[in-house]
Amino acid sequence: LIDPGHGGEELGAITHIWETKNGVKKTKSIYEKDLALLLAKKVKKYLEKKYTTYLTRSIDRTVTLNERANMAETVKADLFISIHINSSNSKRSSGFETYYLDNHADMAIKKVENIENKFLLGDEKEVNQILIDLVIQKTVPSSKKLAKFVHDNLSSRVKKKFKMKDRGIKPGLFYVLALSKRPGVLIEAGFMSNSKELKKLRSSEFIEAYSLSIADGITSYLNTLPPKDIPFF
């Protein structure tokens, strides 16, 4: 199950660019929800050649945390792949990173968690820590392994070709991963707050290369498992 972050009234990160049309210069808003959907659709295109693949949303619509979690149960997803675009108050921040669900004490990572988790709607922000710990216990070995396969593919293809900073594989307490209750990763594809990186994120060449890297990483991970041997609740 591929999860394009945010959607609908949940915009995610926002940045603004200048565009000139018919000789008139105007500002245009760029939303994380739209960039995430573009990437997710491409990942699905590559994976569905071999695997049954679903999206939590295929259009710009609001999807609650519970709806995402319920969809994972309904389709009996083996893996949960959440795709996001990063943002920072510093316009110099750059690079891609891959997260798996686990406890940690890194304050820099907590900032990323706060950004992604704060967009959740209503009382879904309150996620039971006991549930999180149970999911971590069940999924962390598989999720960590999946994160390595995905990130290694991104590093070998995207880092060199697009000269992007590799920010590594990290543990994180993301609610969307916790409630999916299965092995999964959350991918931050790059910083839309960085103007140079934003141009890459919006380019068709980057979207193709990045989505193919994710798909290849997932395929490599699945190829290491015996049939019917992907653990989930």
State where each predicted segment sits.
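Active-site-adjacent mobile loop/cap segments within catalytic or ligand-binding domains
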Residues: I14-T15, N89, I136-F233
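Catalytic-core regions of hydrolytic enzymes
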Residues: L1-V127, D133-V140, K144-K148, E208, ...
